[in-house]
């Protein structure tokens, strides 16, 4: 990237980056029929958007893991059962879990009622209401779906098959968002300025760093 960082993401690894005032990076995935990954963007508060860019690699062996009753939880960020995650955002305090659930197993997670919570189902299927049935196809959520949950203090799932999903929860910033391609700011004017800087080669603010 434009900070001079480079690395290889292997099976189970994680990459964390703060774009801040501007960073240009390139990803070159190796072709594979079995590759599975997720890229999540967290919006920074307006007052922190122009912070210095940062980057870090997190190895799979450094990610805390909890295994019990047919459920495996990898704690990427936040805290679960007294264990802190592999990293913590400086500006956004988020719970980020990678969960694997055996078929017919149940798992629940207490959440902050003031936070937004969503999951993305990598594979498998499940129900999210104890009053629903995994035998009823209309009650079951399938793989490759993102699910945003409403207000509440407990997340609950029962797997209708072996299932893997990521869970993310954080307090909403409640600020406007202007998004265009790889850039997220707060207003259309800021977005226009950012693209002008890209065209003029002034987007990267640390001019002593070379690509």
Where are these regions (language model features)?
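Jelly-roll (double-stranded beta-helix
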Residues: 1-211
């Amino acid at each position: 990237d434009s900070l001079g960082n480079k690395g290889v993401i292997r099976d189970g690894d994680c990459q964390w980056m703060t774009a801040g005032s501007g960073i240009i990076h390139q990803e070159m995935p190796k072709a594979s029929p079995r590759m599975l990954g997720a890229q999540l963007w967290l919006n920074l508060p307006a007052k922190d958007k122009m912070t210095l860019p940062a980057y870090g690699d997190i190895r799979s062996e450094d990610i805390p893991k909890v295994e019990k009753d047919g459920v495996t939880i990898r704690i990427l960020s936040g805290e679960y059962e007294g264990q802190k995650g592999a990293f913590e955002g400086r500006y956004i305090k988020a719970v980020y879990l990678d969960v694997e659930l055996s078929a017919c197993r149940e798992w629940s997670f207490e959440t902050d009622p003031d936070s937004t919570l969503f999951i993305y189902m990598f594979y498998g299927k499940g129900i999210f209401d104890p009053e629903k049935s995994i035998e009823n196809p209309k009650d079951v959520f399938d793989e490759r779906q993102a699910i945003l949950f409403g207000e509440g203090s407990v997340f609950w799932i029962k797997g209708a098959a072996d299932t893997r999903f990521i869970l993310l929860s954080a307090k909403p910033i409640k600020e406007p968002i202007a998004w265009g391609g790889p850039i997220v700011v707060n207003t259309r004017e800021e977005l226009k300025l950012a693209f002008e800087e890209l065209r003029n080669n002034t987007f990267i603010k640390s001019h002593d760093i070379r690509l």
